[in-house]
Amino acid sequence: MASWGQGVEVAFAGQGASEVVNEILIDGPSGNKLAGTFLLPEGASPTHLVPAVVFITGSGLQDRDETIFGHKPFRAIATTLAQAGIASIRCDDRGFGKSTGNGKLATTFDFLEDAKAQVAWLRSRPEIDPKQIGVVGHSEGGLIGLLMSQAPDPAMNFAVLLAPPGISGGEILVGQSADMFTKMKVPPIQLAFTLEKHRQLIDAIVANADEATLTLAMRALVDAQLDCVAKPKPPEATIELTVKQGLAQVSSPWMRTFIALDPAPAIRHISVPMLILFGERDVQVSPARNLPPYQDGILACPVKPVIVIVPKANHLFQPARTGMPDEYAAIKVEIDPEVLKKISDWVVSTTSSQPSSQPTGPISAPPSVPAASPKSSP
């Protein structure tokens, strides 16, 4: 079940086409409501079915456009796809924006179920081809897309993964530390010691160690990190507060799941057409660490994904100088136009070659789309 807002036709200047934007409210799997935007390309109808995608955001609670520093990459991709004849829905994460539910206690697997609910909703729409529904996932959203692609019963028909993790979250965190301290020119012996302390903390979290063990491991890591960056060390009270805050972060259900979840087994069971993009200068999900598991794993896949490294692109697929997050806001380009074109061209090509559910005979009149009452508007 879902409620609709009034359909609003929006013309995109210079494109010579119009799309229909609807506000929607989808029932989630945990009693939560997922508020979002349903974007239909011009001409979509029960007599002219169109492919569609679900957008899945990266880590941290985010809105439907994956807004960051004023950039709205998901809106840009959705608009580009609509102009190519592809419908989409993009929803606020549970517990964020207009969506309900407890996002702070949700894990990757809860967001996976939310994505499946959105795919199911699309399959129920009379304008959408149920055999041509895919996902576009970024970062953690790419991991969720990977998990949805599994044989023998994939949850969708194709996927675009943008900067998907290929290693566990724990290894990603250690790798980020390694990159950061390397850029700071920390001596190799000191760097190795700090990374070992980080791995010991990760191992303790995965082993579900008791609070005392986690506290000792966190304190050892904080001390090692401070030795790399702070001379002299801050006051003891400041260090203790840092340890306390760190423990709170790693104790959340989401973080524990993220740290332990290894994508490698899932990569070997990809069963739908897939486009995987990495940014050459991504320092959050670096291709140097995350690409090799895909290159190795797809050797056993019944369907071989297309993998592309985008030159000079950062984690948000902006053209970048260093790829560091402190550049994101300063870069005026929302998302590299070549990335938009690559995604659009691949989705159009893939759906054009897939089986379709296009009607071939007479069809009854489509059901009307009710305007939402003030109470049911998301």
PLM regions: where:
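Conserved alpha/beta-hydrolase
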Residues: 76-98
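N-terminal cap/lid segment of alpha/beta-hydrolase-fold proteins
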Residues: 7-48
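Conserved alpha/beta-hydrolase "acid-adjacent" motif
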Residues: 283-289
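Alpha/beta-hydrolase active-site loop
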Residues: 105-126
